[in-house]
């Protein structure tokens, strides 16, 4: 009896996702370009020639927004289904956090969000893909910002060591997560936001797990939410993935 190969469901999902992305993205791009052309043509026409010009322009612009959102959702799903190969380097977790916060300085200032950062006094060496880790932190910080509707919006970011592992904790003073929804927040496509894709937190957890880490959530309705990402130290990472890495690695962001 011939041996049967065990199928990898993640690989299958990745193959399906790639096929769907190709089939959907091309007509989606055409729709976006046509909506752009329609908007430009309408804008150039005299108002007297098109009595409903304002309404038609609004429809064209709405189409642009919808197609752009669909394209972003498609990109997010493809990233989840077929995670990119990690480019591991030696980083300081403090520096990754600092650079991510600097990237959001203007956004938070515009939204009236106060950020308080308390970083561990010494470097926290981790083996990581710096870009992916920053993406995960960026998603968590933007989630925290969107969860706050109070007059005084505050995000506290802390790094440290607990249970022998470096961590980063992002705490907001927002609405908190209802008890009934807490089991679902990492479920693909689950969202309670009007324009949410339901991809942000699943991608965060996927990235954290790719790094041998974990993510924990503590939340209280009306008070806020704390998301804690714990990662292995450099030597812990090597022990978890023996033979996967060379002894010498590039330094991607150590102080």
Regions found by a protein language model. Give the residues of each.
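Conserved HAMP-HisKA connector
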Residues: 2-23
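Histidine phosphotransfer helical core of two-component systems
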Residues: 28-68, 88
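A conserved beta-strand-to-alpha-helix junction within the catalytic ATP-binding
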Residues: 89-101
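Short helix N-cap motif at coil->helix boundaries in the Bergerat
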Residues: 93, 176-184
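Conserved catalytic submotifs in the C-terminal HATPase_c
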Residues: 109, 114-124
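Short beta-strand/loop element within the Bergerat-fold HATPase_c
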Residues: 154-164
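Detector for a conserved hydrophobic position within an alpha-helical segment of the HATPase_c
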Residues: 208-209
